[in-house]
Design a protein with these regions (language model features):
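Hydrophobic alpha-helical transmembrane segments
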Residues: 57-76
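Exposed alpha-helical structural elements
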Residues: 18, 22-25, 29, 88, ...
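Transmembrane alpha-helical segments and their cytosolic interface motifs
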Residues: 35-53
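Membrane-interface amphipathic/juxtamembrane segments adjacent to transmembrane helices
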Residues: 86-114
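Charged, low-complexity intrinsically disordered regions
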Residues: 7-12, 39, 43, 99, ...
Length: 323
């Protein structure tokens, strides 16, 4: 990838003055809204605390000493109010800040708070051996690099275990998914997953049925195989895909985003990047002020990674010459 293209995405210094000004203005507006929401929550909390004290005084006068009822009631009201305010704030953040971030990043990218990425799409990647019961996706960014379209979205896959008091929700994946759509098909299906996990899951639960249809690939890079396991229905194509340059790129991505996985199937490349935070929401009511740098944040880095993958795969013409 040339130096000029590698610095196009995600560098605020490359934005023109108008784009920087619009982004800074949006951040200032959201910071003001955060302060207002914080003030409203404090006000409602104070009012609820005062009402709880009055109710408890009445209860005390009637011989009731247990304060849990007024405290619990006040807590529920404050929680519901704060949740409503938080959701409204995030909706505003997406409409004003995220849309301007996507526009500022360029390349004709577009943003939608919804995503068309389905549970079937998630399962078809074959990157997670655990059973998935529920899937949700949102915040989809679409762009184009050369002749390749790509999208980046936020997704969450979960399942429920146990029953009664032991019932709990297990998060299988939460984070970003980058999808690169080429106008050419892969002959097989190749997946790249963390090496340690594949050994643990394979030993405890056995491989998923879709994973059993793939063979473990042996590659020439000892460093790469120490970090990742590669399964494929087409051993030769897997080796064509995972060139030294591609393996170096994946290892670099893994250093920045531990747990990154990749799937090569049909005409698409999928990259999953786990995270505990939503990149398209306000970080918190009591955190640092939102700046253009924070707003662009990891989204710009993920876009940059997607475009580097596109460049690397586009150069490897032998991958496609067999189709």
């Amino acid at each position: 990838m040339s130096q000029s293209s590698s610095t196009t995405v995600g560098r605020l210094s490359t934005l023109d003055g108008a784009a920087r000004a619009k982004l800074a203005s949006a951040c200032d507006y959201i910071n003001a809204e955060v302060a207002k929401v914080r003030s409203r929550i404090f006000t409602v909390g104070a009012v609820c605390a005062a009402l709880a004290a009055v109710v408890y005084a009445i209860m005390w006068a009637n011989g009731v000493r247990d304060p849990r009822f007024p405290l619990f009631g006040a807590g529920i009201v404050v929680f519901l109010f704060a949740t409503h305010q938080w959701r409204a704030l995030n909706k505003t953040y997406k409409q004003i800040v995220v849309s301007r971030v996507v526009t500022a990043l360029g390349h004709g990218m577009t943003y939608s708070p919804e995503s068309s990425f389905t549970k079937e799409d998630f399962l078809r990647m074959d990157l997670f051996a655990q059973r998935t019961e529920r899937w949700s996706a949102e915040d989809e960014v679409r762009g184009r690099k050369n002749a390749v379209t790509y999208s980046i979205l936020e997704g969450k896959a979960t399942r429920t275990e146990g029953s009664g008091k032991n019932r709990r929700t297990v998060v299988i994946f939460r984070g970003s998914i980058a999808r690169l759509d080429f106008n050419k098909n892969f002959a097989g299906h190749t997946v790249v997953v963390p090496d340690g996990e594949s050994k643990i899951l394979g030993g405890l639960f056995g491989e998923a049925s879709s994973r059993r249809q793939k063979d473990l690939c042996r590659l020439e890079s000892v460093e790469f195989e120490a970090e990742y396991s590669v399964y494929s229905t087409d051993q030769q194509e897997a080796r064509y895909i995972l060139t030294p340059k591609m393996m170096e790129l994946i290892l670099g991505a893994a250093a920045a985003y531990p747990g990154v996985r990749m799937s090569f199937n049909d005409n698409s490349v999928f990259v999953t990047i786990p995270t505990s935070e939503n990149r398209f929401e306000v970080g918190g009511l009591f955190g640092s002020r939102i700046t253009p740098e924070i707003a662009c944040g990891e989204l710009a880095e993920v876009v940059h990674l997607a475009e580097r993958l596109i460049d690397t795969l586009d150069l490897e013409t032998r991958i496609w010459s067999r189709v």
